[in-house]
Structure formats: structure tokens, C-alpha cells
């Protein structure tokens, strides 16, 4: 059997040209990889010339071991060179969890788990219930007031036996009341005017009587002051006496006529007409 070197060339690892020395033992590569902090375990390959299998089986084993070492070294290099990616992944997972905990809606997780709604605390539920009650109370009060008003109206209609008066009826009733008040005021004014007329007529009658008495006194004084020696004055003919009686009769007739006819005119007329008629009667 021929001796087979138990080393990997540098060209097999990364495809570069081999170094001038020609070969590098696999033990050095394994020692460098163990120095790196990695969670993945790997095994050292220490070739032994004693009891080696055939050439084909040895080559297959070497290829498998080389692939494993390459994969582990690549992962370690990525973690060392880009630690930010690892932090980003962790931060993203934390934010996803926080959002899922705070949200009240149902959310689906990446693995397919379904999150239920987070129940609110007792204080928040009580606050919401109080707000709903406050909003519902005024609506219920308005509905109750409307129902009460309708019930009162229906009861009044049943009790009275007729419907309530409309606005037109109210206006007519107000107009009738105003008309009655106006008529009463006019009647009161008429009564006052009649009383005033009666008072004025009484004053006129009193003046008329006073004038007649004064006239009779003046006539008596004139007859006493006349000379008694004159025969014509002493001898009074019987024809002259009726003349005096006629004058008195005329004055009485005029007064009676004034008291009957003109009294009505004065009572019906206004103040100016009353004054004019009184002056005309005085001139008679």
C-alpha cells in the first residue's frame, strides 16, 4: 500500500493557489477553529497511517470533514463580522411580542398561534359603563317626559270631553274679550256724560229761576217808587192787568219748553252745542 498524506491542500479549502511550502497539516486548522467562540462542536481530524482504509473511503471522509469545517467557519465569521444582524433579529422579536401583548385585537403569530383579546382591567370597565350610563340617562329622561306629556294630554281630553282649543280659537276669544272691555268702557263714558249733562241742566234751571225772581223784585220796586199823585198811574185799567199776567205766562211757557225740548238736545250734543243753545235760549 502506498502512503497517502493526511493533509488538505489550501486549494481544496478556498480555491487559491497552494503556498510555497506545499502543504499545511489539518491539525493547525482545527486549532484555529477551536480558538473561536462557537456553539457548534467540531472534531479534530488526526490522520493515522496505521490501519487506514482504502483510498476511495478516505477521500470521501476527507470531503465530508472539509465541508463541515467550512460551514462552521463561515457561520462563526458571519457572527463575528456582523453582530448587528443578530441584535436586529432579537430586537425585532421583542417588539413583536410587546405589540402582541398591548393590542386588544386578535393577531396571528409567525408559528400560527392565535392571540386572544386582552381583557381590560376592572377600573377601565367601570369607567366605560359609567360613560354609557351617562349617555343613556338623558335619552331615557326625554322619552319619559314625552310619554308623560302625551299621557296628560290624553287624560285632559278624556276628562273635558273635547279637544284643546287651537290657536285660532284662542285668538278669537282674545278678540271677543277685548271687544267686551271696549264696549264696557264706552258705556261708562256715556254714563259719565249723562251725569255731567244732568248736572249742567240743573245749574241752568237754578240760574233761570234766580233770574225770574230778580225780575219780579225789580218790577215791584219800580211800582213803589213811581209818584202816587199821577192819576194815570193810579188808575189802573183792567186791560193792563192781564198783560202782566201774560208776560209771566210767556216766561213760564218758555221755561217749560226749555226744560222739555232743549234738555234733550243739550244732553245729546257736545259741549259747544250746549253752550250755543244755552246762549240762544237766554236771548229769548
From Swiss-Prot:
The record's InterPro entries line, in alphabetical order, gives: Ermin (IPR045346), Moesin_tail_sf (IPR008954)
Q: Where is this region: Disordered?
A: 1-61, 108-251
Keywords, in A-Z order: Actin-binding, Cytoplasm, Cytoskeleton, Phosphoprotein
Feature: compositional bias, Low complexity: 225-235
Q: Where is it mainly found? A: cytoplasm
Q: List the disulfide bonds.
A: none
A Gene Ontology CC term for this entry?
A: cell cortex
Q: Where in the cell is it found?
A: Cytoplasm, Cytoskeleton
Q: Which residues carry this modification: Phosphoserine?
A: 73, 214, 226, 230, 233
Which parts of this chain are annotated as the region Binds actin?
A: 265-284
Could you tell me which residues carry Phosphothreonine?
237
UniProt-listed GO biological process terms: actin filament organization; morphogenesis of a branching structure; regulation of cell projection organization; regulation of cell shape
Its annotated function is as follows: Plays a role in cytoskeletal rearrangements during the late wrapping and/or compaction phases of myelinogenesis as well as in maintenance and stability of myelin sheath in the adult. May play an important role in late-stage oligodendroglia maturation, myelin/Ranvier node formation during CNS development, and in the maintenance and plasticity of related structures in the mature CNS.
Q: How does it assemble?
A: Binds actin.
Its protein name is Ermin
Q: Which organism is it from?
A: Pongo abelii (Sumatran orangutan)
